[in-house]
Swiss-Prot record:
It is found in: Secreted. It comes from Burkholderia pseudomallei (strain 1106a). Keywords: Coiled coil, Secreted, Virulence. GO terms for cellular component: extracellular space. The gene is bopA. Residues 347-377 form a coiled coil. This is Effector protein BopA. Plays a role in mediating bacterial evasion from the host autophagic pathway. It comes from the Bacteria. It holds the Pfam family SicP-binding.
Length: 512
């Protein structure tokens, strides 16, 4: 089956992409661009010659190839990003009928499909945060921003968490009320947000268009009057769709973030839960979201459309920052007023940094596993590990589920503190035998990171995130080159073990 990657790879040459095929099936490739093709492409733009039969046949053949390529590409986008993402890519990216599917168009259509599908590796996770925004196009179309905290990790659906923060004025604003502080209201779900972001006039046209098409389909086109034929041409644009209650709404841009702690892919419940080291603090975000809603009820908080702190975008950003977004990307406030576009850009930056760190963490895990392929390294590391015998997993599981008693948690924190000290001493012992001339810059950077990033029970989530990011990135760079000796491989395994201690302390910190 042809996938999106095949189109992206073929488009890199700069030529238009075509879909051919043989007995084995369709094949994507870059179009041939020899002297004949170059000549006909030039003649097709010459007024006196473009109507010649040979030139017209060539131009029509190219248009047919381009249409077929576009159809197959949209199908590939649909399979990867869903029908909504593919429709959006077609609506906004394929603007001219028969236009070539070149590198720029492929890149733009993939970007649009990703945008409507949602951005972020956390989308399939059971514990996630979703930042949603609708584009701001001025005071007449201000857009909107909201945030949802989801936790579907528990097998019991009754214990699932769905906390939605959507900040709205309690009344329709007049043209002179953009600076007024008025009573706010909060909406409880994304579906209501979608309905609120589509105008009544657009909704009416969509209903009329749908009704006209149904009537024409049932009665036949020749029996339709002029008004029905006109209404039938009004199709929903990308993002406009009916919900399960047959109400029209406008879908948002979505950015997905993982929650720190144990998580799993909802699509594959058989796989064991894995600890997500880099993410947002779910408990802190829930506390702030509920504080915001209580403030709306009590009147302590107000809504002001043009504001840095009291409009929809600023409230969504407030809850996002409460979860530790600034641990990854510094936040810079808007000069005059927050808006959904600025908020969306910040959310994307945070998501990109979190996903990059988690991908680097997974890469470090795989590379360190390969270090144990050496029998001597594996034996030496097993001897060190068995001498300590401590493990972060019981603490992390119990802390994450809230089942460990305070006494047990403290005992395990003490145990992990001792293990941190033991790993640090082992790393120092391995490094002591290396003279200055044998230590390169990478060795010095890793040794410095091990000193500065050793976790402790006093560290909060921010400190642990900072230490983890420094150690993961430093060790990742160190692993780019193969270890020159067993002691070098063991130093890397010790640094990897220190990351495991950070995970254990992180589990305790988010449960506190």
């Amino acid at each position: 089956m042809i996938n999106v990657g095949a189109f992206v790879a073929s488009a890199r040459s700069g030529a238009r992409v075509v879909v051919g095929g043989d007995a084995r099936g369709p094949v994507v490739s870059a179009a041939r661009l020899g002297m004949k093709e170059r000549l006909f492409a030039f003649l097709a733009h010459v007024p006196l010659l473009k109507h010649c039969d040979a030139v017209r046949r060539y131009a029509e053949q190219v248009r047919m190839e381009n249409r077929r390529s576009l159809e197959v590409f949209v199908l590939a986008l649909s399979k990867r990003y869903g029908p909504e993402g593919a429709k959006a890519a077609f609506d906004y990216g394929a603007r001219r009928d028969g236009a070539p599917l070149d590198q720029r168009r492929v890149r733009n259509m993939v970007s649009i499909a990703e945008h409507f599908h949602g951005t972020g590796d956390a989308k399939p996770l059971a514990r996630q945060m979703v930042f949603r925004s609708w584009e701001c196009r001025g005071l007449d179309h201000p857009g909107h921003a909201s945030l949802t905290i989801k936790n579907q990790a528990d097998a019991d659906a009754g214990r699932h968490v769905y906390e939605h923060v959507s900040w709205w004025p309690n009344q329709r604003l007049g043209s002179k009320e953009h600076f007024d502080r008025i009573k706010p209201k909060t909406l409880d779900g994304y579906r209501i947000d979608k309905r609120s972001e589509i105008s009544s006039a657009t909704e009416q046209r969509l209903r009329e268009g749908d009704a006209a098409r149904r009537k024409i389909l049932a009665d036949g086109f020749k029996y339709a009057n002029q008004d029905e034929r006109y209404d039938a041409r009004f199709f929903p644009r990308a993002g406009q769709k009916l919900d399960k209650d047959a109400e029209w709404g406008l879908s948002a841009r979505k950015v997905y973030f993982p929650a720190i702690g144990f998580n799993h892919d909802r699509r594959d419940t058989d796989r064991p839960r894995a600890f997500v080291l880099f993410g947002l603090n779910e408990a802190a975000m829930l506390r702030d979201a509920r504080t915001v809603k209580e403030g709306a009820k009590s009147g302590e908080l107000k809504y002001r459309m043009i504001s840095k702190k009291e409009n929809c975008a600023s409230m969504a950003l407030r809850v996002l920052r409460a979860g530790g977004a600034e641990h990854f990307v510094p936040y810079t406030a808007a000069w005059i007023s927050e808006d959904p576009n600025h908020a969306h850009a910040y959310a994307l930056a945070v998501q990109a940094r979190i996903d990059a760190l988690n991908q680097r963490r997974a890469d470090v895990e795989r590379r360190c596993e390969r270090l144990r392929d050496s029998a001597s390294v594996r034996q030496a590391w097993r001897a060190f590990s068995e001498a300590g015998g401590a493990s972060a997993s019981p603490l992390a599981e119990d802390a994450g589920r809230g089942r460990a008693s305070a006494h047990m948690r403290q005992a395990r924190l003490d145990e992990h503190a001792r293990e941190v000290e033991r790993i640090g001493a082992y790393f120092a012992e391995l490094s002591a035998g290396r003279s200055g001339k044998h230590r390169d810059r990478a060795d010095a950077a890793l040794a410095d990171a091990m000193k500065r990033c050793a976790p402790s029970a006093r560290d909060d989530v921010a400190a642990l995130t900072r230490k983890a990011s420094v150690l993961v990135e430093t060790l990742g760079r160190h692993l780019d080159a193969p270890p020159p000796s067993d002691s070098s491989a063991l130093r890397r395994l010790a640094a990897h073990a220190m990351i495991g201690r950070i995970e254990a302390f992180m589990a305790a910190a988010i449960a506190a």
